[in-house]
C-alpha cells in the first residue's frame, strides 16, 4: 500500500507545518508502507525530504526552474508525468501551512478516485476567502474524507471564513521536540526572573512588537524581569533589535537567537511569553508545559484547551498592549508561585495531550485508504 503526501508550502524551504506529515511518512515507511511526496522545488533540499528519499520514498519536486529551450526539447526525460497518475497512491494527505492555500490537488484526487485528507496547520482571521472562490474551497473540503485541524479554535475560524460546517472534521496533535517526561531544573531567581519568547521573529504572527510596547512602560522598567527572544529571523529581527535600542530596553530585553535544545532554554527561563496574533497550536506552549513552565499567552490556537487561566498559566483574551499587560501583571503578582504553577502545567499537559502524536496520526492516515473513492 502506498501513501501520498502533498505539501502546499511555498514561502520557504521548510517550516513547522511540515513536521507532522514528514514524521508520519517516515513512520509509515518503518511500518512497511510505500511513501511518495510532492513538494515545491528549492535550491536547498530540506533534510527531512532527503531522509525520506534515502529510505525509499519518491519525491516529486514541482515548480523547478525551466530548462533552456534546447535542453527541454532534447531532454531524455521528456515531460514529467502527472504525480498522481504515475505514483497511484492509495490515499493522499494534503497539508496546508495556512488556510488560504489553494487545494488544486484535490481536484486531481477526485478525478482519479483517490481518497484524500486535508490537514490545516494554521487558520486566522487575517485573511478571508473571497466569495468568488467559496464554491471551490467548499468542494475541496467537502470531498475530503477527513479534515484535520490542530485546534478547535482553528476549525471555528475556517468554518466562519467559508460559511460551512465541517461534518468531516477531527482535531489532531502535532509532535513536540522534548522528552514527554522532561524535568529541567528550576533556575535561580536571585538575579530576577527571565521569561522567553520562543519562535520565529515574525511580528505579524508572534507579536514581538506588543512585548516591546508593554515592556517600555515605566513600571516594567523598574521590575527585575528580563525577556529573552529565541528563534530564527523571519523578516523582523532588525526591527526587534532596533526597537529595543530605540526604547533603551537593553537591560530588559535580549535577542538570544535560535536554539534546538528545548530543555536548555527552560533551564535558563522561568516562563514562556507568547502574545501571538494567530496560531494553529503553538508547540512552544506544549513544550514549555512539558518542561513544567507556565505560559503567558493569548487565547489563540489550542491555548484555552490546555491552560487553566490563573492556575497553570495566564491567558490574554487578545493580542493587544492592554490585554497582554493585564495578563503579564497578573502573572507578576504570582511570580513567587511560578514554580508550583509550572508543576501543575506539567501535570495538565500530560493529561490533555497525547504522548505519541505521530503514531496516532499515522493510524488515521492508513484509515484514509479504506475510505470509499471520491468522485
Model regions and ranges:
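A short, active-site helix/loop in glycosyltransferases that binds the activated sugar's phosphate group
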Residues: 142-168, 176-178
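Glycosyltransferase donor-sugar binding loop
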Residues: 37-45, 198-199, 226-239
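Nucleotide-activated donor-binding/catalytic signature segment of Leloir-type glycosyltransferases, i.e.
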Residues: 240-257
Amino acid at each position: 500500500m502506498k501513501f501520498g503526501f502533498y505539501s502546499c508550502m511555498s514561502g520557504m524551504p521548510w517550516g513547522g507545518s511540515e513536521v507532522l506529515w514528514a514524521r508520519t511518512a517516515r513512520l509509515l515507511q518503518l511500518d512497511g508502507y510505500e511513501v511518495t511526496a510532492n513538494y515545491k522545488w528549492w535550491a536547498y533540499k530540506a533534510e527531512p525530504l532527503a531522509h525520506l528519499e534515502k529510505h525509499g520514498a519518491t519525491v516529486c519536486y514541482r515548480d523547478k526552474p525551466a530548462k533552456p529551450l534546447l535542453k527541454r526539447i532534447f531532454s531524455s526525460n521528456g515531460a514529467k508525468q502527472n504525480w498522481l497518475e504515475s505514483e497511484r497512491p492509495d490515499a493522499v494527505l494534503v497539508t496546508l501551512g495556512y488556510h488560504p492555500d489553494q487545494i488544486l490537488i484535490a481536484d486531481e484526487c477526485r478525478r482519479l478516485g483517490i481518497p484524500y485528507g486535508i490537514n490545516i496547520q494554521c487558520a486566522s482571521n487575517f485573511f478571508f476567502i473571497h466569495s468568488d472562490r467559496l464554491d471551490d474551497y467548499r468542494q475541496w473540503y467537502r470531498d475530503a474524507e477527513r479534515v484535520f485541524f490542530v485546534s478547535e479554535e482553528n476549525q471555528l475560524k475556517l468554518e466562519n471564513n467559508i460559511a460551512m460546517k465541517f461534518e468531516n472534521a477531527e482535531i489532531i496533535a502535532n509532535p513536540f521536540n522534548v522528552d514527554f517526561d522532561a524535568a529541567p531544573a528550576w533556575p535561580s531567581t536571585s538575579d530576577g526572573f527571565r521569561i522567553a519568547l520562543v519562535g520565529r521573529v515574525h511580528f505579524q504572527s508572534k507579536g514581538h512588537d506588543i512585548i516591546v510596547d508593554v515592556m517600555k512602560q515605566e513600571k516594567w522598567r523598574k521590575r527585575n524581569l528580563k525577556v529573552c527572544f529565541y528563534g530564527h529571523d523571519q523578516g523582523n529581527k532588525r526591527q526587534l533589535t532596533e526597537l529595543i535600542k530605540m526604547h533603551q530596553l537593553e537591560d530588559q530585553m535580549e535577542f538570544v537567537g535560535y536554539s534546538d535544545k528545548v530543555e536548555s532554554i527552560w533551564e535558563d527561563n522561568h516562563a514562556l511569553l507568547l502574545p501571538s496574533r494567530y496560531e494553529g497550536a503553538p508547540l512552544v506552549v506544549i513544550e514549555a508545559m512539558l518542561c513544567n513552565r507556565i505560559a503567558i499567552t493569548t487565547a489563540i490556537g489550542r491555548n484555552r484547551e490546555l491552560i487553566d487561566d490563573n492556575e497553570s498559566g495566564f491567558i490574554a483574551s487578545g493580542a493587544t498592549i492592554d490585554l497582554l499587560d493585564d495578563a503579564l501583571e497578573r502573572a507578576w503578582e504570582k511570580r513567587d508561585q511560578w514554580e508550583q504553577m509550572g508543576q501543575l502545567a506539567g501535570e495538565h499537559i500530560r493529561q490533555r495531550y497525547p504522548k505519541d502524536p505521530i503514531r496516532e496520526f499515522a493510524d488515521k492516515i492508513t484509515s484514509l485508504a479504506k475510505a470509499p473513492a471520491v468522485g
